[in-house]
């Protein structure tokens, strides 16, 4: 049984349509979607939204407490990657995924970049954040530091891919222009 005090509000309003119709949005109470979160240990911090209008909720580096290590730190070696535990399980609602994104301060000040970042509805384990360090300097994080942000994204899995010999019968103004095709200025 989940302790109701450990539930948090994902947003102030419905992201996908703004409605509060219970038949259409059965997982919502009023306008706030409730998402269950489980702390795996007492030091785990719940995700927090710094401002009510922020899309993302901050995630924290929260390893399980160890008596033999009073202050836990983790280093990401130059050009290396490390997995950072959050100490949380988050139940992703039906029709959504949880996307783990860079925090601007972590990526711009420390150069740490989030790796594989999709948490599917079917995943039931602890949320880990994969941080990559493309710099030439070791980066160190302490337990309790902000490491990334989590964003709930509406998705559809009601898709069937159908193989075709040609998919674009009409020309578009972009065509097959890829990265950098519009120039720098």
Question: Can you name each region flagged by the protein language model?
Answer:
Residues 2-10, 14-18, 26-185:
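DUTPase catalytic domain/fold
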Residues 22:
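Short functional micro-motifs and their immediate structural scaffolds
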């Amino acid at each position: 049984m989940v302790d109701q005090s450990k539930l948090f509000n994902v947003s102030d309003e419905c992201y996908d349509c703004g409605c509060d119709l219970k038949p259409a949005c059965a997982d919502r109470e009023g306008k706030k979607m409730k998402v269950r979160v489980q702390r795996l240990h007492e030091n785990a911090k719940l995700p927090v939204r710094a401002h009510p209008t922020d899309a993302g909720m901050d995630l924290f580096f929260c390893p399980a407490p160890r008596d033999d290590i009073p202050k836990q730190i983790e280093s990401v070696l130059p050009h290396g990657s490390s997995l950072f535990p959050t100490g949380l399980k988050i139940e992703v609602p039906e029709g959504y995924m949880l996307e783990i994104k860079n925090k601007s301060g972590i990526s711009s000040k420390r150069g740490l970049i989030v790796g594989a970042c999709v948490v599917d509805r079917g995943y039931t384990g602890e949320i880990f954040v994969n941080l990559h360090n493309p710099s030439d300097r070791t980066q160190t994080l302490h337990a309790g530091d902000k490491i990334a942000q989590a964003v709930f994204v509406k998705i559809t899995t009601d898709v069937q891919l159908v193989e075709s010999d040609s998919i674009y019968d009409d020309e578009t103004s972009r065509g097959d222009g890829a990265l950098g095709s519009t120039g720098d200025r």
